[in-house]
UniProtKB/Swiss-Prot annotation:
Role this protein plays: Converts 2C-methyl-D-erythritol 2,4-cyclodiphosphate (ME-2,4cPP) into 1-hydroxy-2-methyl-2-(E)-butenyl 4-diphosphate.
Gene, per the UniProt record: ispG
Family annotation (Gene3D superfamilies): Dihydropteroate synthase-like (3.20.20.20), Sulfite Reductase Hemoprotein, domain 1 (3.30.413.10)
Family named by the database record: Belongs to the IspG family.
Keywords: 4Fe-4S, Iron, Iron-sulfur, Isoprene biosynthesis, Metal-binding, Oxidoreductase
Chemical reaction(s) catalysed: (2E)-4-hydroxy-3-methylbut-2-enyl diphosphate + oxidized [flavodoxin] + H2O + 2 H(+) = 2-C-methyl-D-erythritol 2,4-cyclic diphosphate + reduced [flavodoxin]
Statement: the UniProt record of this protein carries the keyword Membrane: no
Cofactor detail note: Binds 1 [4Fe-4S] cluster.
Pfam entry (one): GcpE
Protein name: 4-hydroxy-3-methylbut-2-en-1-yl diphosphate synthase (flavodoxin)
Length: 371
C-alpha cells in the first residue's frame, strides 16, 4: 500500500513460451525450481512437482540423465500440469525422446552433446515441436580451453562460453531460447549476467548456483539476484538451495516481493521484537505464515508489537496490528478501527480478517463487468 513506487527499467528482451508460461518481453518474471528426487521414482517426483505447484512454481526442471529416466519422464508429464524442463547433458537421443513425450523446454548446452549432426537433430526437433531451449553455462563446468585461456572462471570466460552456444543456435536459425551464466560466487555471477545482458536480446534465466543451505543460500541468492533484478536484468529465476525445493519457490517470490516486481500471497511486515512488545510477535508471524500459505492474493500485513513504529507501519499496510496493553490496535486499509484484538487471540482474529478481505477482493474481481 505504500505510495512510494520504485522505478526499475526492465531490460528489453525477446519473448518465448515454456509451455503456457511466457518468459521475457513484458511477461512477469517466472519463478522456477528443480526436483531432487530420482526421476525414475515416478511417484516421488510427481508428488514433489505437485507440492511445488501448490506454492506457486511457474516452471519446474527435472533431470533426465538416462533413457530409463526419459521413460519415467513420460509418465511424470502425463500426471502433472505445470510446464516441465528436461535437464539433459551429453546424450542427444534423450532430448529427442523427451520431445516425443511433450517436454516444454530442453536445458542443454549444444556444445556438449556431440557432433554438428546431433546438435542439428535436437534443434530441428525443437523447431518442429515448438520447444524452447535453455543454454545453461556454469562456472563449475567451463570448457577446458576456456579454463586454460582465462586461468579460472571469470565473467569474460562465462560470457564467451555462452556466446559459443548462442552462435551454434544462430547458425541453425533457432531463436527460441533463453540463457543462464551461473556461478556460486555472487560477484562473478552478477558481472557475467551484466555482460550477457548487453550482448544478446534473448531472455535471461537468473541463478546463483550451489548457493548453499536454506539460510545461507537464501541470503546469497537474495543479494545476487536482487542486484540484477534491481537493474532490470532477468526474466526467470531459480533460487538454488540445499534444502526442500519448496523453499526455493518461497524465497524466489520473497525476493520479487521485496523489490515490488511481483507479489504473491501475504507480505508480512513484522518487528524483530524487544521488551516493549505487548504480544508474542514472533509466534504470531510464524503461525500466520503457516496458516495462510494457501493465499495467493497479494496483501501487506504489518504485525508490530508496540506503539513506537506500529501505527506508522499500519498506515501503509492493507491490514495491521499494533501492540497495546491486553488489547492491540487494528488497522484496515491504513485506517485505525474501533475494534481491538485480544492479545491472547491475535492469530485467530487476524487470520479471520485477512481471509475476509481476500474473499472480498476475489469476489470483486469476479463480478467486475467486462468492458
Amino acid at each position: 500500500m505504500s505510495a512510494f513506487k520504485p522505478t526499475i527499467k526492465r531490460r528489453e528482451s525477446t519473448k518465448i513460451y515454456v509451455g503456457n508460461v511466457p518468459v521475457g518481453g513484458d511477461a512477469p518474471i517466472a519463478v522456477q525450481s528443480m526436483t531432487n528426487t530420482r526421476t525414475t521414482d515416478v511417484e516421488a517426483t510427481v508428488t514433489q512437482i505437485k507440492a511445488l505447484e501448490r506454492v506457486g512454481a511457474d516452471i519446474i526442471r527435472v533431470s533426465v540423465p538416462t533413457m530409463e529416466a526419459a521413460e519415467a519422464f513420460k509418465l511424470i508429464k502425463q500426471q502433472t500440469k505445470v510446464p516441465l524442463v528436461a535437464d539433459i547433458h551429453f546424450d542427444y537421443r534423450i532430448a529427442l525422446k523427451v520431445a516425443e513425450y511433450g517436454v516444454d523446454c530442453l536445458r542443454i548446452n549444444p556444445g556438449n552433446i556431440g557432433r554438428e549432426d546431433r546438435i542439428r537433430a535436437v534443434v530441428d526437433c525443437a523447431k518442429d515441436k515448438n520447444i524452447p531451449i535453455r543454454i545453461g553455462v556454469n562456472a563449475g563446468s567451463l570448457e577446458r580451453d576456456l579454463q586454460e585461456k582465462y586461468g579460472e572462471p571469470t565473467p569474460e570466460a562465462l560470457l564467451e562460453s555462452a556466446l559459443r552456444h548462442v552462435e551454434i543456435l544462430d547458425r541453425l536459425n533457432f531463436d527460441q531460447f533463453k540463457v543462464s551464466v551461473k556461478a556460486s560466487d555472487v560477484f562473478l555471477a552478477v558481472e557475467s549476467y551484466r555482460l550477457l545482458a548487453k550482448a544478446i536480446k534473448q531472455p535471461l534465466h537468473l541463478g546463483i548456483t550451489e548457493a548453499g543451505g536454506a539460510r545461507a543460500g537464501a541470503v546469497k541468492s537474495a543479494v545476487g539476484l536482487g542486484m540484477l533484478l534491481a537493474e532490470g536484468i532477468g526474466d526467470t529465476l531459480r533460487v538454488s538451495l540445499a534444502a526442500d525445493p519448496v523453499e526455493e519457490i518461497k524465497v524466489g517470490f520473497d525476493i520479487l516481493k521485496s523489490l515490488r516486481i511481483r507479489s504473491r500471497g501475504i507480505n508480512f511486515i513484522a518487528c524483530p521484537t524487544c521488551s516493549r512488545q505487548e504480544f508474542d510477535v514472533i509466534g504470531t508471524v510464524n503461525e500466520l505464515e503457516q496458516r495462510l500459505e494457501d493465499i495467493i492474493t497479494p496483501m501487506d500485513v504489518s504485525i508490530i508489537g508496540c506503539v513506537v513504529n506500529g501505527p506508522g507501519e499500519a498506515l501503509v499496510s492493507d491490514l495491521g496490528v499494533t501492540g497495546g496493553n491486553k488489547k492491540s490496535g487494528y488497522y484496515l486499509n491504513g485506517e485505525r478501527q474501533k475494534e481491538r484484538f485480544d492479545n491472547d487471540d491475535i492469530v485467530n482474529q487476524l487470520e479471520a480478517r485477512i481471509r475476509s478481505k481476500v474473499a472480498m477482493q476475489e469476489n470483486r474481481i469476479e463480478v467486475s463487468p467486462v468492458e
